[in-house]
Amino acid sequence: VKKDDTILLLDSDAFPIAPMGDFLDEKLKTYPFVSAQEPMHEWDRDPLYLIPHPMFMAFKAIHILEDNLTDYLREIIKDKNDNWWGGTINWLKERGYYYYPLTRSNKADLHPLYYAIYDDLIYHHWAGSRNMITRPDRIRAQETGENVDDIAKENHEVSSQVFERVSSETDIDNMMAYLKGEYEES
């Protein structure tokens, strides 16, 4: 690997939906790190608390070769989030860096967290490799009195339907257009 090579980390249930080479080249001229923005937590509604999420992280190889980023990528920080990727926050702060946050750009939201498009570049299913209950679902259950297990079952059913569409060569474009607000479901 060369120092100026771009390293891209991508979750197993995320994939590009548009060319992103030029976008990353441009952003990495200004920012040392490009990442999806962590969705807000129920205990932290501060929109200025931007947490890089590992479903998508891009940076130049020099940060691994000479700047110790590898150690920070696997560091669990003990704060209100206790996440294993929290070390990136420390890495950014210690160096005075800011990152470019990819933000959710869906126009149609089937769920407040799942089935997300970020900056019209990346699709993230969010439910591909974990339990089907989320922070927004727990808030919903608390506010409505619904059973969390019923919400998880509903999430699983919708996830299966969406996954079938995004894994279909004939339907993926329609699904992405729908989530972007460019296509009406019939």
Model-inferred region functions:
Residues 1:
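Short, conserved alpha-helix that lines the donor NDP-sugar binding/gating region
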Residues 4-15:
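Short beta-strand-to-loop acidic/aromatic patch adjacent to the donor-nucleotide binding site
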Residues 11-12, 19, 103-105:
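Short, well-ordered beta-to-alpha junction loops that form the rim of enzyme active sites
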Residues 15-90:
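Conserved catalytic core of nucleotide-sugar-dependent glycosyltransferases
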Residues 41, 53, 63, 111, ...:
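Histidine (H) residue identity feature
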Residues 65-140:
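Catalytic core and acceptor-binding pocket of nucleotide-sugar-dependent glycosyltransferases
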Residues 94, 98-102, 124-186:
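C-terminal, non-catalytic tails of nucleotide-sugar-dependent glycosyltransferases
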